[in-house]
């Protein structure tokens, strides 16, 4: 199994999967939420999100190389959670567009940082396996988010589903902080 997965970066891949789960939820349920609430031109969410995400990816690389992982991933998770809370609350076009910006900022900082961490935590001969592990986590998250979002929205409603997503992201931010602090105490500094 070591030939297919880099166990050193499974936690990073799972957290990255949470960002992808958010993508699956937004892609599947933003339009029905907008129709339910009468929010027009909802497709602009995806355009705004893509533009900000593109700009974020152009600029975040240098910051990632100089900044502690926790100082990027945890705020990115919290910003993402805020965006899902905004979507859950939204009743107007502009609130959804603001959420698009925040979602891109969170996703852009978080996923790139986690991918970089996956690559850094393995020897050079396992970079491909680490990258594959990262993307497996992202792929699982994408599918799982849509499925779980469908179950939650069928029991409650779309707004509640987005609120619950925000809560899960905040909890994961806390758990990731605990994990990373513990990992740093147990892993030699030159392996981090």
Describe each model-derived feature in a short phrase.
Residues 124-134:
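Loop-to-transmembrane helix entry/capping segments in MFS-fold secondary transporters
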Residues 68, 89-91:
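Helix-breaking motifs and short loop linkers at transmembrane-helix boundaries and internal kinks
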Residues 151-169:
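A membrane-interface helix-boundary motif in multi-pass transporters
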Residues 71-86, 166:
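Structural signature of the two symmetry-related core transmembrane helices
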Residues 8-47, 53:
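Extracytoplasmic gate region of multi-pass secondary transporters
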Residues 12, 94-100:
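Short hydrophobic/alpha-helical segments at membrane-entry points of transmembrane helices
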Residues 56-68, 153-154:
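Helix-to-loop junctions at the C-terminal end of transmembrane segments
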Residues 109-122:
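Intracellular juxtamembrane helix-capping segments at the cytosolic ends
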């Amino acid at each position: 199994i070591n030939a297919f997965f880099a166990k050193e970066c499974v936690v990073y891949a799972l957290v990255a999967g949470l960002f992808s789960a958010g993508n699956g939820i937004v892609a599947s349920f933003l339009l029905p939420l907008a129709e339910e609430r009468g929010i027009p031109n909802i497709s602009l969410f995806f355009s705004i999100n893509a533009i900000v995400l593109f700009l974020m990816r152009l600029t975040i690389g240098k910051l990632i190389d100089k900044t502690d992982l926790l100082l990027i991933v945890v705020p990115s998770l919290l910003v993402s959670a805020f965006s899902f809370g905004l979507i859950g609350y939204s009743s107007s076009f502009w609130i959804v567009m603001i959420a698009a910006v925040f979602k891109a900022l969170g996703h852009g900082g978080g996923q790139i940082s986690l991918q970089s961490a996956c690559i850094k935590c393995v020897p050079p001969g396992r970079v491909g396996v680490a990258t594959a592990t990262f993307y497996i986590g992202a792929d699982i998250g994408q599918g799982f988010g849509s499925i779980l979002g469908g179950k939650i929205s069928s029991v409650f409603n779309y707004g509640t589903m987005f609120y619950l997503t925000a809560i899960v992201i905040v909890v994961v931010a806390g758990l990731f902080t605990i994990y990373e602090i513990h990992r740093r105490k147990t892993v030699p500094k030159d392996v981090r």
